[in-house]
Regions:
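Small-residue-enriched core segments of transmembrane alpha-helices in multipass membrane transport
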Residues: 33-34, 72-89, 108-114, 184-197, ...
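Transmembrane alpha-helical segments of multi-pass membrane transport proteins and ion-pumping complexes
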Residues: 4-8, 13, 17, 47-50, ...
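Membrane-interfacial loop-to-helix junctions in multi-pass transporters
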Residues: 1-2, 42-45, 81, 97-105, ...
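Transmembrane alpha-helical segments and their short flanking loops
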Residues: 164-288
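Loop-to-transmembrane-helix entry motif
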Residues: 33-47, 71-79, 109, 113, ...
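Juxtamembrane helix-boundary/capping and inter-helix hinge elements in multi-pass membrane proteins
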Residues: 18-24, 32, 63, 98-102, ...
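Signature of multi-pass transmembrane helix bundles
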Residues: 1-104, 288
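Helix-loop-helix junctions within the multi-pass membrane cores of secondary transporters/permeases
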Residues: 111-194, 248, 261-268
Length: 288
């Protein structure tokens, strides 16, 4: 399975560099297949609540309420891990790399983070993320328009973390002995699959089935965590968006953008709005 993922990444990379008509035709075919598969996936997701109810009811009937305690520990473990990554590691990275207060960037990103949490979709949040980073954090359009769309696809911090914890939890539930080599393979597979995960709700479940197959577990084992997935999906999406914005701010500062996080959010919005009006006026004058 790991070899298939690596091959897919290389195939996609070299297909993107192929500029011939046949290369474009192949890209169109693959894109069409992707669109169809996503529609099928969304149809299946619509019936997920019914399936989750049946799975949980059957499990509780067989084992009693004892099955709920491990699931609660799994839920708590993921929340703590996401919290440490978002509120400890990321703020330290901002402070060290930008020499600015992390609280200022957190305040700037609140609208985007709330939208990401409620929608559970990085793609749906992307326009608001770009607006917050540009107008409230002071990052240039040139930097944010390059980093954020790319990050929404390949920089899935929360997703990769969740996939690792979920795969290990399911493996332990099935009584699988996780050697150090197996754990390392889970981490690598989670990192690679998180790169290609679609920015839509519940897309991580597809990636987890890939990881389960890589360690010899059946795909239906994912039913063990479906009951908690919606809430955790909202949390990890917010972490994904937060991670993208942090990388953008750090990169902007490394490129010499001194205005990044240099002013309070209210003042930054005024400055960026005024600058935007000035740029449009200058462009209009040149055209006239």
């Amino acid at each position: 399975m790991l070899g298939l993922i690596v091959f897919s990444l290389l195939f996609g990379f070299f297909l993107r560099t192929e500029r011939s008509p046949s290369g474009q035709s192949l890209r169109n075919i693959i894109d069409g297949i992707y669109q169809v598969v996503m529609k099928i996936t969304m149809l299946v997701i619509r019936f997920t609540p019914l399936g989750v109810f049946a799975l949980i009811a059957a499990t509780v009937t067989r084992t009693g309420m004892d099955a709920i305690e491990p699931l609660a520990w799994f839920f708590l473990t993921v929340l703590v891990a996401l919290g440490l990554h978002a509120f400890v590691f990321m703020p330290i990275l901002i402070a060290l790399a930008t020499k600015r207060s992390p609280l200022r960037h957190i305040q700037a990103m609140i609208p985007a983070l709330l939208t990401a949490f409620s929608s559970a979709s990085s793609a749906a949040t992307l326009p608001l993320t770009m607006e917050c980073v540009q107008k409230r954090s002071g990052v240039s359009t040139r930097t944010s328009s390059f980093v954020l769309p790319l990050g929404a696809t390949v920089n899935m911090d929360g997703t990769a973390l969740y996939e690792c914890v979920a795969a290990m939890f399911i493996a332990q539930a099935y009584g699988l002995d996780l050697s150090l080599t197996t754990q390392f393979m889970i981490v690598i597979t989670a990192l690679l699959t998180s790169i290609g995960v679609a920015s839509i709700p519940a897309a991580s479940l597809v990636a987890i089935t890939v990881i389960l197959g890589a360690i010899g577990l059946p795909a239906e084992a994912i039913g063990l965590i479906l009951v908690t997935d919606r809430v955790l999906d909202m949390c990890r999406t917010a972490v994904n968006v937060w991670g993208d914005s942090v990388v953008t701010v750090v990169l902007a500062r490394s490129e010499g953008e001194e205005q990044v996080l240099s002013l309070p959010v209210s003042e930054m919005e005024t400055v960026t709005t005024t600058a935007g009006h000035a740029d449009r006026d200058a462009t209009a004058s040149e055209q006239s």
